Swiss-Prot record:
InterPro entries: PsdUridine_synth_cat_dom_sf, PsdUridine_synth_TruA, PsdUridine_synth_TruA_a/b_dom, PsdUridine_synth_TruA_C, TruA/RsuA/RluB/E/F_N. It comes from the Bacteria. Pfam families: PseudoU_synth_1. The gene is truA. The active site is at 53 (nucleophile). Formation of pseudouridine at positions 38, 39 and 40 in the anticodon stem and loop of transfer RNAs. The lineage of its organism: Bacteria, Bacillati, Bacillota, Bacilli, Lactobacillales. GO terms for biological process: tRNA pseudouridine synthesis. One of its GO terms (molecular function) is tRNA pseudouridine(38-40) synthase activity. This is tRNA pseudouridine synthase A. Keywords: Isomerase, tRNA processing. Homodimer. Belongs to the tRNA pseudouridine synthase TruA family.
Amino acid sequence: MVRYKATISYDGTLFSGFQRQPNARSIQEEIEKTLLRLNSGIPVTVHGAGRTDAGVHAYGQVIHFDLPQERDPEKLRFGLDTQCPDDIDIVSIELVSEEFHARYSKHIKTYEFLVDAGRPKNPMMRNYAIHYPYPLSLALMQEAAMELVGTHDFTGFTASGTSVENKVRTITQASVSIDEKTGFYVFAFSGNGFLYKQVRNMVGTLLKIGNGRMPVSQAKTVLESRDRNLAGPTVAGNGLYLKEIRYE
């Protein structure tokens, strides 16, 4: 078998998430259906680096799959791209060794989250950013975001009931900025892995800090206490983007 690594992007609005699930549309299933046609009716399993949730978008999701023969990567990319639905784009495909695994090979993920704090809101962006119509202090959110950088137990920022036992992760970069073109707040996080809804819970906490309803020290308090109840709300997934995945 020959292994292929692909970088893909997608608009997550009409998907139930990346992972295949019964009676729901998923990115994994759509790509597998297309590969089935390209592989003479023989099923192909797609493995993704990140299992994004419903409504979450991606610029740089990475997948891998195996085919029984070697094909020209660009011709394969073109065939897969043109036969996939319009809300999925196959950015690139390359040949990799059988040791490569999109999910388990060591990598750094970068997520971005967009917040429209304008009044009135921009209805054209309702599927691509959350609306937060309250005053925000960029400086307070930037200061609090720095507390998240480093190796920590992120139990307080993950969804309750998760089956993952080891909740220690390393965040190498956390920032908050304003996009000069749109005026949207851009929350960016890079790390070696993220827990279920971790990014959305961190953004929810930073927004409360930026609005003055939580102290700047709250991010550190949540980390130290490991208490989800002390963090902010889980923001909606439509503002979240899997921006990039870099492998070692």
